[in-house]
């Protein structure tokens, strides 16, 4: 499930460092988190949709790797992002 343009723009303005910032880890993690929450809601209704479940696991792994990178590079930005998004630190893959 992909995000529509309005949602992407809203996430970029909220988490980006400048206009059109799509590459920073904060924006990427925020977009992945939104897609993960959307897929989680979808799977609550469609319990046997195994293709979407696999996609969800791939997205969670991708988000975990981005969070590990951010924790290694700048722990303050990592902690601020985890607090803003409400992600558990254990799920983020950093100590």
From Swiss-Prot:
GO terms for molecular function: rRNA binding; structural constituent of ribosome. Part of the 30S ribosomal subunit. Forms a bridge to the 50S subunit in the 70S ribosome, contacting the 23S rRNA. The gene is rpsO. It comes from Streptomyces avermitilis (strain ATCC 31267 / DSM 46492 / JCM 5070 / NBRC 14893 / NCIMB 12804 / NRRL 8165 / MA-4680). This is Small ribosomal subunit protein uS15. It comes from the Bacteria. InterPro entries: Ribosomal_uS15, Ribosomal_uS15_bac-type, uS15_NS1_RNA-bd_sf. GO terms for cellular component: cytosolic small ribosomal subunit. It holds the Pfam family Ribosomal_S15. SUPFAM superfamilies: S15/NS1 RNA-binding domain. The keyword Glycoprotein does not apply. One of its GO terms (biological process) is translation. Keywords: Ribonucleoprotein, Ribosomal protein, RNA-binding, rRNA-binding. One of the primary rRNA binding proteins, it binds directly to 16S rRNA where it helps nucleate assembly of the platform of the 30S subunit by binding and bridging several RNA helices of the 16S rRNA. Forms an intersubunit bridge (bridge B4) with the 23S rRNA of the 50S subunit in the ribosome. Belongs to the universal ribosomal protein uS15 family. Signal peptide: none annotated.
